[in-house]
Every structure is written in C-alpha cells, then in structure tokens.
C-alpha cells in the first residue's frame, strides 16, 4: 500500500512514522485484584496540552469534603476537581515543600496540617482561604539540644494533639497540643524493634479502638515496615514487614493504602494482610527514581510512589516522587 502513496507522503511515513500514532489515545490500564481492582484515568491531572500541571513532586494527597483533591509539590499546593482540572492553588512561601499533609474539619471549617521538611516546621492553614493559623517549630524545650529538624509526617489525634515526625533527621516523633505547645516526644533513630530508620509517614489508625498511630519505618533494614504506637508514645507492635520502602499510609474503613517508593502501591485489609499490589514497576532502574521524565511515564506503572488518598467512592489518588510532577487517579471497579 505504501507504493501507492504520493512521493511526499511516502517520505513522511518512512521518516516520521511516529506521526501516524501521535494522536493515538492512551487506554486505561486495569490493575489489582478482587474487590481492590482499579482502572487508571489516562491524562488525569494534566494540562490541556498534555503536560504536568504541578511541577516536581515530593509530597502528599488529601481530599476535602467537597471531593476536591489537594496535592503538594515543590511549588506549592494544587487543588484539582474530581475530573482532574486545577481549580485553585496556593503557591510559594508557606505552601512550598509540604512533604506530608492531613486535612481535618474543625468547628465547621477545614484545615490542612503539613510537614515542611526543607523548611523545618509543621504548619496549619485554612484549606479554603490559605490563612496560616499555626506553626510548629522545633521544640527546644524537648531537651534534645541542637538537632537537625526535617519533619516528614504529621497527624492529629481526636483531642487535636498534633504529632510531627522528624523522619529525615533524628527520627523523634514530637507531640504538641492544639495551640502548638510541646508536650512530649518518643522514638529514636536505629534499626531496633522500637527504633525508626526514617519515620517517613504516619496517620491515625482508626481501624482500632482506641485509635493508634500507624507509622512507616521506610528505611528499616532489612524489613521496610509499619509500626503501631499508642498516642502516648508506647510501642504496641510491628504491624507488617517486607514492604520495600513504605512512604505513607492512608486509611478508608478497614483498608490501608501504602505507597512503596520502589514504584508500587500496596493495599492491606484490617488484618494487615496484603490484598493487592498496584502499579508495580518491573524496571529496577526506574524504581525509587525521581528523574523519570514525563516522556518516559508508562500508564499504570509507578516509579517513586510517595503519597495516596481515598475518596468517598473508594477511588485512589496517587502521587509519584517525580521531576516533572505526577499525580494519578485510579477508579475502583465495582
């Protein structure tokens, strides 16, 4: 058939075959198994020109009561509609370098708590106005001396006490009251049973009564594990091991999503048994790799899975640690 084309068209086909496929749509990829089966949403979160809307990502994902999705990037916090369009952003200044976020309703308003690793503080701001209402600096009254302070994770207890993990430094977890007054700390760096080797992620484990802290011990050797601690800082148990480099935890009902920096997302049930593994990257060179440009992204394959969050329908939003900034939507298959 090529021989019947005009000479100029034949030359174009031979020299630029990619033109034939430039407009080929990307198909959804199905992943997971059983009740934890998901389809990707190609192009979700991208600009109309197909480029990333957010720039380099090393952060988190949360969702407000209206269903809007907040993700943190180097530049600031971007707010997406469920359809994947940027509807608002908080850029520069106080909103940069939010390594972890938690969103809470308090007295009829929604607030985002954030851990700013490169800026050595925790922060609380109004999710809808951006007003900063609280800062959590290193608590010198802890008596630990002049230590490095690089917070990686934050969570809030039912009584509004705040827990802030110094996961990129001393690995202490600091507890403050709702006004920001230092109360206590626990933990230390190490590979022992009750120590942390990068207490990278943390949330309240609401599957238990009373609630517990669920902590990602990302670089623990050789395990890569999750731990339970009481809200008083008492060790409870090693929850699960063998998770690679668990970066964060998000809970909906009985289920936990655990991003693994090696390029996959693990889902656990209430017994902390693995139910499904999503987005597994088969290429060792592209696992835990920040420098995978958008041109090398593969639909349904993760590279540096760093944050995740469930919406009310059980869909997942996943952020990769990535030079160009990647956030993905996974739709639960009913």
Locate each region found by the language model:
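Beta-rich, blade/repeat-based domains predominating
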Residues: 50-66, 94-108, 141-161, 191-212, ...
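Blade/loop signatures of beta-propeller domains
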Residues: 23-43
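Short loop/turn segments immediately following the C-termini of beta-strands
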Residues: 74, 117, 167-169, 207, ...
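Surface-exposed loop and turn segments in beta-propeller and other repeat-based domains
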Residues: 42-51, 91-94, 133-145, 181-194, ...
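Blade-level signature of beta-propeller repeat domains, shared across WD40, Kelch, NHL, RCC1
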Residues: 303-334
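Blade-loop segments of beta-propeller domains
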Residues: 48, 74-111, 116-117, 140-142
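Conserved beta-propeller blade signature
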Residues: 68-70, 111-113, 161-165, 212-214, ...
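Beta-strand-rich domains and repeat architectures in extracellular enzymes and scaffolds
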Residues: 42-75, 325
């Amino acid at each position: 058939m090529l021989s019947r084309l005009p000479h100029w068209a034949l030359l174009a086909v031979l020299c630029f075959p990619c033109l034939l496929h430039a407009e080929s749509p990307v198909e959804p990829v199905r992943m997971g198994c059983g009740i934890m089966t998901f389809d990707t949403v190609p192009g979700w979160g991208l600009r109309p020109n197909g480029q990333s809307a957010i720039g380099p990502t090393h952060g988190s994902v949360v969702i407000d009561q209206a269903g809007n999705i907040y993700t943190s990037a180097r530049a600031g916090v971007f707010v997406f509609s469920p359809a994947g369009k940027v509807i608002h952003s908080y850029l520069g200044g106080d909103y940069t370098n939010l390594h972890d976020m938690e969103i809470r309703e308090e007295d009829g308003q929604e607030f985002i708590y954030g851990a700013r690793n490169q800026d050595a503080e925790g922060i609380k701001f109004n999710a809808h106005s951006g007003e900063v209402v609280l800062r959590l600096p290193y608590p010198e009254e802890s008596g630990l001396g002049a230590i490095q302070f690089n917070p990686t994770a934050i969570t809030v207890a039912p009584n509004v006490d705040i827990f802030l993990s110094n996961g990129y430094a001393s690995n202490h977890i600091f507890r403050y009251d709702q006004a920001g007054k230092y109360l206590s700390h626990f933990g230390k760096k190490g590979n022992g049973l009750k120590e942390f080797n990068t207490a990278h992620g943390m949330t309240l484990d609401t599957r238990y009564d009373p609630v517990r802290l669920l902590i990602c011990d990302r670089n623990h050797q050789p395990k890569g594990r999750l731990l339970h601690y009481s809200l008083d800082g008492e060790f409870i148990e090693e929850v699960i091991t063998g998770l690679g480099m668990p970066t964060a935890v998000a809970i909906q009902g009985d289920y936990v999503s655990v991003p693994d920096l090696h390029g996959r997302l693990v889902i656990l049930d209430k017994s902390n048994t693995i139910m499904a593994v999503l987005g597994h990257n088969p290429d060792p060179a592209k696992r835990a790799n920040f420098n995978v440009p958008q041109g090398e992204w593969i639909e349904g394959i993760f590279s540096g899975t760093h944050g995740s969050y469930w919406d009310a329908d059980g869909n997942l939003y996943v952020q990769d640690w990535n030079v160009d900034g990647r956030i993905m939507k996974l739709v639960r298959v009913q």
